[in-house]
Amino acid sequence: MTLITRRSVLGAAVLTAAVPVVADHDRAIAADADIDLAGWTLLGVGDEFTDPTHSSAQWHRGLWYPHSGSGLFRDANVSFSGGQLHLAARAEQVDSFSYTFGAVESVFDVPGLCTYVEVRAKALPSAARVLSAIWMQSSALDGGPSLLTGAEPNPELDVEETFDYTKMNIATHVWPDNTEVTHRRFGGHAYPVGVDISRDYHTYGVERRDGKLRFYFDRHLAWETKPGDPSLWRMSRHMVLSLEGHLGAPVVHRLPASFDIDYVRAWYAPNPALEPGDYRLTSADGRFLAFHDGVPTLQAQPQTWCVVRHDDCTYSLSTPGGAVLGLDA
């Protein structure tokens, strides 16, 4: 039997009346639009920042670009203490830069499909005018300038960037060649939260499944979107936490200051109701999905399909002869 690994058949030519190829999971959103993690599995990836030695090995200091605006990334601006990760912004002259920033990229992958990833953090104080960023992207962890080879189109999820401290500012991109020439922006959303987020700790989360991205502020749904590229909801990514110079010159007398991260956690979605096995797939009018002369069709006579679940939470349908719907049909 022909199987597919780590490949969705979302693009398969499935007839409208047939059962969807990708299982329709129960939504993780309760009636009040908050995510409900009951039944989800907390994964071992992430960091609670309770062990500085362990955390230091989990995070690469610096990014694949050496500076952001007038701020130079420095390893010394990254510290682990008090059960937290601290990224500092300082007014100090280093080379031609008047400021220094902290930034880290995880050495571990945050899984993609069928997951919810959450960061609890307190943004650097708004009065200092240094942007705090929570995002997902993967580099080679060698200081740059390239993103991870073989991970094209290099999807990027900006979960929060403090362009406006009273909003959760979200954006999505892909960087196929890691250049502006091929860079594609798919838009974003600014979700008003009604408070200055830098005054307290908040959670920032993203759920990736069912072909959708769902972003959460304090576990309240902030934005749901069908991304412009499937890699945005499928591919694993590194977690990036950084200070950026996108707000212009920092306010010197408000520095030093820090962006404080309490934890990074990831959950895996509850198992779907559909179990692997042999099925007959019917349409609303009682006809059966069948494979005839190399073409999927609806007919009166039933045909058995083998449903196979893959490790990325997708499914494939194959005939007894081994033809896979979406690949061979």
Stretches found by the model and what they are:
Residues 1-16:
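N-terminal secretory signal peptides and thylakoid transit peptides that target proteins
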Residues 9, 32-272:
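GH16 jelly-roll
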Residues 19-33:
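C-terminal region of N-terminal signal peptides and the immediate post-cleavage residues
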Residues 66-67, 265, 292-302:
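Short, flexible N-terminal segments of the mature chain
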Residues 69-79, 287, 300-307:
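Short small/polar-residue motifs
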Residues 88, 120, 216, 282, ...:
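Beta-strand residues in well-ordered beta-sheet regions across diverse protein folds
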Residues 272-294, 304-329:
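Extracellular glycan-recognition/adhesion modules and their associated mucin-like linkers
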